[in-house]
Design a protein with these regions (language model features):
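Bacterial N-terminal signal peptides that target proteins for export
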Residues: 1-14
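Cleavable N-terminal signal peptides
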Residues: 12-13, 23, 211
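Intrinsic-disorder/low-complexity accessory segments
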Residues: 26-135, 139-164, 211, 217, ...
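Carboxylate/His-rich catalytic cores and anion/metal-binding grooves
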Residues: 145-148, 163-185
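Short, solvent-exposed turn/loop segments enriched in Gly/Ser/Thr/Pro and often Arg
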Residues: 171-173, 184, 239-246, 715-716
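Active-site-proximal cap/loop segments of hydrolase catalytic domains
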Residues: 177-202, 206, 222, 226
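Proline-aspartate-enriched helix->loop->beta-strand connector
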Residues: 228-242
Length: 891
């Protein structure tokens, strides 16, 4: 039997009262420490409150230990509570070591594994608060901990404490918990009580902290993954909100499709966990659980899903949410029409009938969801542990018989630091990486010493395969028609070598002993030593290397001079037009920078033709209706040494932008988000609106006076009517039965490689297309096409693209003259989620001030004539009127 029949309707409600009944005063109740019970109407505990309560528990019980596991983005300690019996906690290090051995399976046979299983405990990860506005998650962790620590003579909890070691995260996002709670407290009792937060609840990426599961760009995701690798939990359970209305909780099984790189043991037990949870909730009189509807887990980068590629049972649930801690009453006539009859379905067995929904209800559902997982783990401890071992054992065996037998990343590439970064990402995900000695060969190719090899006969190598291979999303067209069905929840292709511009070779023959003898395991990637050769007036560094931009910005900050070579010059990557030329600082200073950024330099004579670069004044639009794309852009620019200044609505609406900025970047957002933002009455007055017509007028003035305006993806499309540009978005108004691409990697061809905008970009880069535009020029266009999709060729490299003929031969990126200035439109995200490193240069190349060459002569009209023509037109409203929050999907 997988679940327990309770004697009371809600375990959490009963146990919160047990202290007063049984006199367990030594274990403090939440109310005794916080002055409130988690789940109380109109009350939310912030991170300080939460940690204070957990420390009070740890001071009064030998069943809990607190550990600091890292720092948040804003520098707060991230803490976890480890809960089990006192006897188990006394042997915690031993159990962690055993869990790791079973998870990796490398030094065990079946009998040894079975022997370890008999004496081992099953480690479970449960958390709350990854998405901070899904507030019940953080509140439920306190209740769950209290229940586990205060139970007396409870067979279910006694079994859990004896068999399970719970790694309980009070929150995965301390900074975000504080932001949301303090915002709610500030507005409590006003008409803005349930207002949305007007900024990202993670400093840079907000909701996308659950899209960073393999790239590990953010500190919080680095900490979570490091801790997962330390504890090797068999189950990784992440609590989210909100469920598809009117369901009260969404639980596994997931919708299809699912990756074939996931172990069958994991796939089947994901279903078991979900069906058991459904039965457990029913037994506890908790109606409204639904499965399959809406959520698939095709994308590998969900933080709460990436662990499946390490053979963990990793999943999430979505509990119903109104807004913060404010209750709401629902009647059945508010339900979608098909749900108003309250009819039971196969995956919605006990429909919710409506009524009041309090934060306490959400907390109770989460507590019982967590208890169902702990109860299941306690009753199936040996099976779960042995399955974890078998999954690793079988993965190792599979890749000893089937290709790819290894992946090789040469350390001699157009952008070697990017190659090293890709190898380091594998290490950070728990994958063993080896450096080669001289003479290593594979597939008949000799690789330089220091190249990196990932043998696939290791326990977590499914992660490498998932990230390196091209994704092929299952057919999403209805048989015999062009109609799209079963459309994906998130992006469908993410192949990292393509995104990062790194050559990775799959080894098609088994590794033999002589090859393995030439490999040395590395824990941290060491890049080849940067070199300085030659003598000359300036030092040339390659424009093909992303890290060169870090070096350039550091040199400018030190008072150096930087220019772009307009004639071919020698660099460490070969002869190159567009190379950076560094001068004005000492040889020692340049040498120090080359070592810091692993970028080699060559001393050369100053070429006859150069373009002098200057540090630009960069403005990055930061709307109050938050843009995740803005946050990613800000993070990337800061990491590369640029100094963007946030531009808010009031800044854009003010005149004389050119007196303060040289370049303005508009991140991806909906047209309504750009123009209108939050409506009146939704948020306090200072956060209302978007750039508005005044802002567009001032952006026109800014560019006309010589400024550079850069726009990504949907915003690029919005600017066409707003600024009367002689460009058309060929996908405007096109329905999914004629074209669909929610996120895939597409090949483009570079036009005008001689232009500074394309310096360092490969001839045929791969871009992340995510529901963006594709362009064609109209009469009067004066400018240049920077990249276009191939003609009569499907540009798809990885993921799902329906009806590629709609964009074949169309423009992906362009630059056009506007008065004295320029506008750059990118119909994709060149900085997608901090992953698409190969296209960063499309953005970076535009972030310096210099005297740019004139645009190509094929244009018919002069910039002045075109500007006058554009100014004579009224700025049209954008055709699309999306919701400003349409990026904020729940999972």
């Amino acid at each position: 039997m997988l679940f327990s029949k309770p004697v009371q309707s809600s375990l959490s409600a009963c146990l919160l009262a047990v202290a007063s009944i049984t006199g367990l005063a030594q274990i403090p109740t939440p109310a005794s420490v916080l002055g409130h019970t988690p789940g109380d109407d109109f009350y939310l505990a912030d991170y300080g409150d939460t940690i204070r309560y957990f420390h009070a528990l740890a001071a009064s019980s030998d069943r809990i230990k607190m550990f600091t596991v890292g720092k948040s983005t804003r520098g707060q300690d991230i803490e976890v509570a480890v809960i089990s019996s006192a006897a188990n906690l006394a042997k915690l290090d031993e159990y962690k070591k055993t869990a790791g051995r079973l998870a990796r399976a490398e030094d065990l046979n079946d009998e040894q594994a079975k022997e370890l299983v008999r004496s081992s405990k099953v480690i479970i990860h449960i958390d709350g608060g990854l998405h901070s506005d899904e507030v019940a998650g953080t509140q439920h962790t306190m209740t769950l901990a209290y229940n586990l620590l205060t139970a007396k003579n409870d067979p279910e909890i006694d079994s859990i404490l004896d068999n399970v070691i719970l790694v309980l995260w009070p929150t995965l996002n301390p900074d975000g918990q504080d932001m949301v709670v303090h915002w709610y407290r500030q507005n409590l009792g006003t008409k803005y009580e349930v207002s949305p937060l007007p900024y990202l609840y993670q400093e840079y990426v907000g909701h996308d902290n659950n899209r960073d599961g393999y790239m590990l760009n953010m500190k919080e995701e680095q900490v979570v993954t490091k801790t997962e690798l330390e504890y090797s939990p068999v189950i990784f359970y992440c609590q989210h909100q909100t469920a598809p209305f009117p369901a009260r909780i969404w639980i596994p099984p997931f919708s299809d499709p699912i990756s074939s790189n996931i172990s069958p043991y994991v796939r089947s037990w994901l279903n078991v966990v979900g069906t058991n949870m459904s039965a457990y909730l029913d037994a506890h009189n908790m109606p409204g659980a639904i499965s399959e509807s809406r959520f698939d887990n095709w994308y590998a980068g969900f933080t709460d899903w990436a662990g499946v590629f390490r053979n963990g049972i990793s999943f999430f649930t979505e509990t119903a949410l109104y807004r913060y801690a404010t209750p709401r009453f629902y009647t059945a006539d508010e339900f979608p029409h098909n749900d108003q009859d309250l009819r039971a379905l196969t995956m919605y067995t006990t429909p919710w009938e409506g009524g009041w929904w309090h934060l306490k209800d959400a907390v109770d559902y989460m507590v019982d969801g967590s208890m169902s997982v702990l109860d299941l783990a306690a009753k199936n401890r040996e099976t779960l542990l042995y399955n974890r071992y078998q999954a690793a054992r079988d993965n190792i065996a599979h890749f000893r018989k089937e290709p790819p037998f290894a992946y090789v990343i040469s350390d001699k590439q157009a952008d070697t630091p990017e190659a090293g970064l890709l190898a380091q990402k594998m290490i950070d995900n728990g994958i063993d990486v080896y450096a080669t000695k001289a003479g290593f060969q594979a597939n008949g190719v000799s690789y330089p010493a220091g190249s990196w090899v990932i043998p696939m006969d290791q326990p977590y190598s499914a992660m490498a395969k998932e990230l390196f291979e091209r994704q092929r999303y299952p057919d999403a067209l209805e048989n015999g028609t062009s109609k799209a069905i079963d459309l994906p929840y998130d992006v469908t292709g993410w192949t990292l070598p393509l995104q990062m511009g790194v050559d990775v070779d799959a080894v098609t023959d088994p590794l033999i002993a002589d090859q393995r003898a030439m490999l040395t395991k590395v824990d941290t990637i060491k890049l080849p030593d940067a070199t300085m050769e030659g003598a000359g007036a300036v030092f040339a560094i390659s424009h093909k290397v992303n890290a060169s931009f870090q070096l350039v910005n550091a040199a400018l900050a030190q008072g150096g001079t930087v220019s772009l070579a307009q004639d071919p010059v020698k660099t460490a990557q070969g002869s190159e037009t567009g190379a950076f030329l560094i001068g004005g600082i000492t040889h020692a200073a340049v040498d120090s920078l080359t070592k810091k950024y692993s970028v080699s330099a060559v001393g050369v004579a100053a070429p006859a033709h150069t373009l002098a670069l200057k540090k630009a004044r960069i403005g990055l639009y930061r709307p109050w209706a938050p843009s995740i794309d803005e946050g990613w852009t800000r993070w990337i620019l800061e990491n590369y040494g640029f100094e963007p200044k946030s531009l808010y609505n009031a800044d854009i609406r003010s005149a004389n932008l050119k007196s303060r900025y040289d370049i303005i970047v508009l991140p991806d957002m909906s047209s309504r988000g750009l123009m209108s933002g939050f409506g009146v009455g939704i948020v306090p007055g200072q956060y209302v609106g978007g750039v508005g017509e005044d802002g567009i007028d001032h952006l026109r003035e800014f560019v006309r006076d010589g400024g550079t305006l850069i726009a990504f993806n949907r915003t690029a499309s919005s600017l066409i009517p707003l600024m009367s540009l002689p460009v058309a978005n060929v996908l405007q108004g096109v329905k999914s039965d004629k074209f669909f691409c929610s996120g895939a990697l597409l090949r483009v061809e570079t036009d005008h490689a001689e232009m500074p905008a394309n310096y360092g970009v490969s001839e045929s880069p791969v871009v992340m297309f995510q529901a963006g535009p594709a362009f064609e020029t109209l009469p009067g266009f004066h400018g240049a096409v920077l990249a276009r999709y191939p003609k009569q060729t499907n540009p798809l490299e990885s993921g799902l693209l329906l009806h590629p003929e709609a964009i074949e031969g169309k423009i992906a990126a362009l630059e056009l003259a506007y008065g004295k200035g320029r506008i750059l439109l990118y119909g994709f995200k060149p900085q997608f989620r901090g992953q698409s490193h190969a296209t960063y240069k499309y953005l970076f190349n535009e972030l310096y001030s210099f005297d740019r060459p004139p645009l190509p002569a094929e244009a018919a009209a002069s910039g002045k004539e075109k500007a006058e023509a554009m100014e004579s037109k009224a700025a049209a409203k954008p055709a699309a009127q999306e919701d400003p929050d349409d990026d904020d999907i729940e999972e």
